[in-house]
């Protein structure tokens, strides 16, 4: 009976939430760069990609008190956050004739730079191997 009550409460909460509607990119770099500029910013050994899902990591809040105040600073995570992306599809730069076209003609979502090499995860309790994709705007 308790299980049914909890499930009903969760279902009612989910139905009461507002509709997300149109999803806008977290990192809106598609309007800033042409295809060639974006590929140059990604660099060698990476692939320009269009990604569905963003996990923004690295946002920190600094507290200016305590014994170890500022000892690590932003060494563990950056102050602005880095976008780690998944659900990515490769954008073919070489096959496109209009290299000077803006990225938004090819990608309406989040533009990222993904590793070319395959990720390998072995020897752990839980192994997950996914290619690392970082948002184009996260790259300096």
Curated annotation (Swiss-Prot):
Signal peptide: 1-16
Cellular component aspect of the GO annotation: extracellular region; fungal-type cell wall
InterPro entries the record matches: Hydrophobin
Subcellular location: Secreted; Spore wall
Name of the gene: rodB
One example GO MF annotation: structural constituent of cell wall
Complexes and interactors: Self-assembles to form functional amyloid fibrils called rodlets. Self-assembly into fibrillar rodlets occurs spontaneously at hydrophobic:hydrophilic interfaces and the rodlets further associate laterally to form amphipathic monolayers.
Name of this protein: Class I hydrophobin B
Function comment: Aerial growth, conidiation, and dispersal of filamentous fungi in the environment rely upon a capability of their secreting small amphipathic proteins called hydrophobins (HPBs) with low sequence identity. Class I can self-assemble into an outermost layer of rodlet bundles on aerial cell surfaces, conferring cellular hydrophobicity that supports fungal growth, development and dispersal; whereas Class II form highly ordered films at water-air interfaces through intermolecular interactions but contribute nothing to the rodlet structure.
Disulfide bond annotation, renumbered to this chain: 42-113, 50-107, 51-88, 114-133
Induction: Highly expressed in biofilm conditions and during infection in a mice invasive aspergillosis model.
Mutant phenotype after disruption: Does not affect the formation of the rodlet layer.
Family: Belongs to the fungal hydrophobin family.
The entry's keywords: Disulfide bond, Glycoprotein, Secreted, Signal
A Pfam entry, by short name: Hydrophobin
Glycosylation site list: 117
